[in-house]
Amino acid sequence: MAQADPADRDRLIVALDVPSVDAAKAMIDKLGDSVGFYKIGYQLAYAGGLALVPQLVDAGKKVFVDLKLHDIGNTVARGVESLTALGATFLTVHAYPQTMRAAVEARGTSGMKILAVTVLTSYDDADLTDAGYALGVRDLVEARARQALAIGVDGLVCSPEEAAHLRGIIGPRMALVTPGIRPAGSAAGDQKRIMTPARAIAAGASHLVVGRPVMEAADPKQAAEAIVAEIAQAK
């Protein structure tokens, strides 16, 4: 479960939220050696993007497969077993006990790390109430984090607003991956619980997931390099 301190460049994970493999490859070419870690989520994965994972790994990059698996234990386990062959560094599952246990058991000794998603960064207390939860965001995130730690997942995905609190619970070595990262002056978009890169690192995040501020920048490579520089200064 230990998480080594990654190089500054590899603490930035760029979300390849594009509709095609060709668009992803074009962005990867633009970013060059400024980015060493990419996230593939639903949009790209369902457009054939999982085939990019071994290609990126062969090119010396790391990949975060963000599928947020959640199903009965056997189904999750079989899915995880299939995904281990791709060579990804991270895979997400939702932080439900049965789902987490199945994923941890199925990944075996593959080296792929299981990250549990606590509460989506687009949710706030009102959203949880609408969904029927009795707990607010902070309490639900903490409860799920403690369950994940007991089950043996390798890391958590949480809002940067919860990073400092969770780092105190899980200790210094477990991965803590935070989306909802917006450099100063960037629009929040559909994220409700956001933070700048420097503040998120200072709060205890091990990795930052950044999409639109890089992908939609006039100069994506320059935008990525600026975030990496901010990460380095915040340590």
Swiss-Prot record:
A Gene Ontology BP annotation from the UniProt entry: 'de novo' pyrimidine nucleobase biosynthetic process
GO molecular function: orotidine-5'-phosphate decarboxylase activity
Amino-acid positions noted as binding substrate in the UniProt annotation, renumbered to this chain: 17, 39, 66-75, 121, 182, 191, 211-212
The UniProt record lists the keyword Transferase: no
Taxonomic superkingdom: Bacteria
Active-site positions on this chain: K68 (proton donor)
Secretion signal, residue range per the UniProt entry: none
Enzyme class: lyase
Family: Belongs to the OMP decarboxylase family. Type 1 subfamily.
Function: Catalyzes the decarboxylation of orotidine 5'-monophosphate (OMP) to uridine 5'-monophosphate (UMP).
Protein name, UniProt field: Orotidine 5'-phosphate decarboxylase
Top-level taxonomy: Bacteria, Pseudomonadati, Pseudomonadota, Alphaproteobacteria, Hyphomicrobiales
Gene name linked to the record: pyrF
